[in-house]
Amino acid sequence: MGDTGTLVLLRHGESDWNARNLFTGWVDVGLTEKGRAEAVRSGELLAEQDLLPDVLYTSLLRRAITTAHLALDSADRLWIPVRRSWRLNERHYGALQGLDKAETKARYGEEQFMAWRRSYDTPPPLIEKGSEFSQDADPRYANIDGGPLTECLADVVARFLPYFTDVIVGDLRAGKTVLIVAHGNSLRALVKHLDHMSDEDIVGLNIPTGIPLRYDLDERLQPVVPGGTYLDPEAAAAGAAAVASQGAAKA
């Protein structure tokens, strides 16, 4: 491992709205039973491969917090320091939050749907303050005036990377194994940075739920293996394909 620590990225287990194929964003939904099982299994994988975290970073959303708790429990690491920040939250999907992905695709067309869902710099329409799935009155975001009203991936990069550089990198430089339990788009933002992916290439990156992704970093914090290594590669490939297919109408 050398003087630089190891970074482990973990997307939360399947959420209730993942299962229902809804845009979630900052809406605070829980895990399905499948998602809880994924979280437990992720901790088992960490223990089996002797990749035990020294510190955990996660978001302010329960699907990530619960995943982190279950993973640490199954890896017998509940005692490690836990640091939470809104900067690790999922991308805010604006007015799309709560909408069915397949219905949204059918209504607006493939091109607009994919631009909102996967492009680097196209945000969805703004969510209306005070609406059902808005966070403007949520006390956890009082210090940031309720948070954003929409975001594209570039916005997530802008809010997450300074936190990574100013806070998380310090633990990596200290030789710690750092576990980040977050969300599909906040992790895509970080992977884009780590792997120097272009704005075009990041469009095709899909991160599966509940499978740890290991990055060994050199002294310059560059990945030893570009793209990292999933602890369960077969499950990761299947999970990424499932994420890519979201938006398809269910039979």
UniProtKB/Swiss-Prot annotation:
GO biological process: gluconeogenesis; glycolytic process
Keywords assigned: Gluconeogenesis, Glycolysis, Isomerase
Site annotation Transition state stabilizer: residues: H183
Cysteine pairings via disulfide bonds: none
SMART domains hit by this protein: PGAM
E.C. numbers: 5.4.2.11
Keyword presence, Isomerase: yes
Active site positions, chain numbering: H12, E90
Pathway info: Carbohydrate degradation; glycolysis; pyruvate from D-glyceraldehyde 3-phosphate: step 3/5
Entry similarity comment: Belongs to the phosphoglycerate mutase family. BPG-dependent PGAM subfamily.
Protein name (Swiss-Prot/TrEMBL): 2,3-bisphosphoglycerate-dependent phosphoglycerate mutase
Gene source species: Mycobacterium marinum (strain ATCC BAA-535 / M)
